[in-house]
Amino acid sequence: MTNLYPKRTRTKLANKQKMIRVAINLFARKGYQATTQEEIAQDANLHLQTLYRHFRSKEELAIAAAELSVSDCNERFKNNFSHANTFEIWRKWIKSSSSFLLSLGIGEEKRDRLCSASSLMNDNYLLIIYSGYEDLLTHYIAQDFCMDVKIDRLPRLVAGMLWNGNEAAMKRCAGKDTQSNNLHNVNHVLAESLAVVDDIEAVFKGHIKLQRRSHELFSDTHSSSQFGPMGER
């Protein structure tokens, strides 16, 4: 029994991580409301009861998924912030994470949510993850701008623009403003999502005061946890 316990523990942890990763992808592709716990268990090749042993509700799973997604993004920032600014890191994060999820396809449920009058209210995952990404971006933007968030409101304002820019880009691609559905066009969605980051950077880049070394390579490891232009991760 002594020898089996560590193996069982590792298996439980691996199963839990697998379910969280699958949930991140499904929430991004279909939206929180349209994703069922049965689908998550099935895509993770696990029994539904295994999922319930780890997560008593879908909301509990969404919280874990949001925390992991923000943690992945934070690792990207920690690995690159000494030689790249917030806008550069965020742009590459959007590109790599979104490319992965777009390759899996966006469901019609997701498009319907994006075009609805209450798109955020219908997606608990987005509501849960919002504060995590906004806090993360605020932290690094404040360092870039050499500002104190206790005094200056600009870092959180810019962070909110970067985060909400993902939702804005996806709404445009879903036809909210353009009356043309381009969610199936990976290149179009990526271009729209990155253009949002570029537009915000063009306005606020002049506020960057932090000096950096320029000789280091950018760490751009792939992440399967989503957020990117879907507005989730």
Report the location of each language-model feature:
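C-terminal peripheral helix-coil segments that are non-catalytic and often amphipathic
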Residues: 2, 138-146, 168-233
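Residue-level detection of the helix-turn-helix DNA-binding "recognition helix"
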Residues: 42, 56-57, 67
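Short hydrophobic/aromatic patch on the recognition helix
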Residues: 44-55
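Hydrophobic alpha-helical connector segments
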Residues: 75-111
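Alpha-helical DNA-contacting segments of helix-turn-helix folds
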Residues: 15, 60-69, 129, 133
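Short amphipathic alpha-helical segment with a characteristic S/N-K-E followed by hydrophobic residues
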Residues: 19, 57-62, 72-73
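Amphipathic alpha-helical packing segments from all-alpha helical-bundle domains
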Residues: 118-146, 153-160
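Basic, helix-initiating cap at the start of DNA-binding domains
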Residues: 1-30, 34-46
